Amino acid sequence: MSKLYVGSEVGQLRRVLLNRPERALTHLTPSNCHELLFDDVLLVEAAGKEHDAFADTLRQQGVEVLLLHDLMVDTLAVPEAKQWLLDVQISDFRYGPIFARDLRRYLSEMDNEHLATILLGGLAYSELPIQSASMLPRMKQPLDFVIEPLPNHLFTRDTSCWVYGGVSLNPMMKPARQRETNHLRAIYQWHPIFAGQDFIKYFGNEDLHYDNANIEGGDVLVIGKGAVLIGMSERTTPQGVENLAANLFRHGQAKEVIAIELPKHRSCMHLDTVMTHMDVDTFSVYPEIMRKDLHTWRLTPKGNGEMQVEALHNYLHAIERALGLNHLNIITTGGDSYEAEREQWNDANNVLTVKPGVVIGYERNVYTNEKYDKAGIEVLTIPGNELGRGRGGARCMSCPIERDDI
């Protein structure tokens, strides 16, 4: 019987959540892409075909693929879920009480397929057929968004992350992504796959403003044996790490959290853009984060709900200790310094492990893939000329929901 549990980064992957890029990407333009956290606009049809190849590769490895749009449609079929989502996404504070009421009424009358498409992909004022007495729509331009598109939903890794016997519903750093978490809150609460199942919601499920306690799943590596590795990047804060760690310890789901301070720039957006776990003793690492000046801490439960925080000198040694290994096999990004920088930018280090020693990655990263092959790692390559321009690889685009221990 399947279960909602992720025990490692490298054990057999059994179920995963993806989101095929569709309507949201059609709303990306050169003038708004940076606000929506993209560096460029993508060819939507080509990106969809590349994503299909990714999903098919997973299925060929025996992995069950769940698609976010399908889960949203099923969830919206539950009246309580639909009402909750419309209330939180179309709030009086966001739109004003008059326009929020009119917009909720219009959306509530849509069929669930169309509504899911709008909530994920956005809606412009020019596409809105209703009239409202509110001042707000009269002050907007036709191409302004009534509902902003969520192109970053492509990266299902970030919005929620499963850690051992539970899930963190992550308070996202950037406003362009904060609505995403509510979709996962609804799915995990009401969708038939999850409703009534025995799993823990560690963090982010309350109707709270989490202030500076931000965490994103791309920074969270479940390295196994009760250990969790978390990067403090430009998107994940120490406050977020400590809150998640406290809840993991409170529920007895982790024995330690290793936290690494990452350089705060775009190429190190998340830990998994510079480091991924490929086999029990093997990691892919971009050389920049092998510097000795990166601060590292080890968080452990101290009893009575308190934590001990210990400064460490070397995060790689901390990983060895956590996994009971004498030595880690580190594979650095391939090519000379120019090639390595280019391939890291194109997500060479952001691979998804489907079972020990077998990973999925972009075919374009030829130098790094060659290094993986020589080290005994099998790379199942997928096209990524368009998807890669979104600055996310196979790990970014996947949220494991069921994975074996190591």
UniProtKB/Swiss-Prot annotation:
Whether Cytoplasm counts among this entry's keywords is: yes
* Cellular compartments annotated: Cytoplasm
PANTHER family (alphabetical)? ARGININE DEIMINASE (PTHR47271:SF2)
Q: Keywords in UniProt for this one?
A: Arginine metabolism, Cytoplasm, Hydrolase
Q: Which GO terms describe its molecular function?
A: arginine deiminase activity
> What is the source species?
Vibrio vulnificus (strain YJ016)
Q: In which pathway does it act?
A: Amino-acid degradation; L-arginine degradation via ADI pathway; carbamoyl phosphate from L-arginine: step 1/2
Q: Mind telling me which SUPFAM superfamilies this protein's record contains?
A: Pentein
Q: Where is the active site?
A: 396
The main enzyme category here is hydrolase
UniProt name for this protein: Arginine deiminase
Entry GO CC: cytoplasm
The family database entries (NCBIfam families) matched by this protein are listed as: arcA, PRK01388.1
Could you list the residue ranges that cross the membrane?
none
Q: Which GO biological process categories is it annotated with?
A: arginine catabolic process to ornithine; arginine deiminase pathway
Listed under catalytic activity are:
L-arginine + H2O = L-citrulline + NH4(+)
Query: Which family does this protein fall into?
Result: Belongs to the arginine deiminase family.
Q: Which InterPro entries match?
A: Arg_deiminase
Report if keyword Hydrolase is assigned: yes
EC number(s) from the headed UniProt entry: 3.5.3.6
